[in-house]
Amino acid sequence: MATVSMRDMLQAGVHFGHQTRYWNPKMKPFIFGARNKVHIINLEKTVPMFNEALAELTKISSRKGKILFVGTKRAASEAVKEAANNCDQFFVNHRWLGGMLTNWKTVRQSIKRLKDLEIQSQDGTFDKLTKKEALMRTRELNKLENSLGGIKDMGGLPDALFVVDADHEHIAIKEANNLGIPVFSIVDTNSDPDGVDFIIPGNDDAIRAVKLYLGAVATAVREGRSQDLAVQAEESFVEAE
């Protein structure tokens, strides 16, 4: 079972919050104290909360649930893409377009356009166009790939969101709340935990911390998927008898 220890968290700097003057009072229950005007997060709270979140994510993926990783700030962007790809899930790592979940119908049309352009770029269609037209389509393709590439094969709304920074991704969280999609999120001392179903109090800026969370989540999701495959194999074996 995917778990993260106190030692792992200390080494990654999960306990370092933001400067005390930027705090959100709603995070008070998760703060241990302050050192040099920086809030220290209580890892005695974080460790069990994160491990509970991991267990739930394993459960969701064992039921073929789709997990959408969200982290659009530069520090997290590459790690988010990597983690999602590692467990065959989906991601948004550049910009959250308003309505990405709540206006899925429109997003689906944009994904169709992206896939059409991908085919055109590979089947020689671009070569038959004028230089200017080909350039415009290439730009459109790159722009769509940037914003929708991580969800183009999702095929519908996700079953859960894993968010790296609750403050930065508040629009994504609000959309998930409106649709009843559970939200798992890293919540730093400057963030509002409201709207997050599984709160993970922790540093959301240090790349080592971000990679620790994402690596553990990817492992939890993979475990869930292998449980699902094991059940499928068992069922087909029983049918074959």
Curated annotation (Swiss-Prot):
A GO CC term assigned to this protein in UniProt: cytosolic small ribosomal subunit
Gene3D superfamilies given in the database record: Glucose-6-phosphate isomerase like protein, domain 1 (3.40.50.10490), Helix hairpin bin (1.10.287.610)
Keyword match Signal: no
Keywords: Ribonucleoprotein, Ribosomal protein
Source domain of life: Bacteria
Molecular function per GO: structural constituent of ribosome
GO BP, sorted A to Z: translation
PROSITE patterns for this protein: RIBOSOMAL_S2_1, RIBOSOMAL_S2_2
PANTHER family per record: 30S RIBOSOMAL PROTEIN S2 PROKARYOTIC AND ORGANELLAR (PTHR12534), SMALL RIBOSOMAL SUBUNIT PROTEIN US2M (PTHR12534:SF0)
Family label: Belongs to the universal ribosomal protein uS2 family.
Protein name, per record: Small ribosomal subunit protein uS2
Species this chain originates from: Yersinia pestis
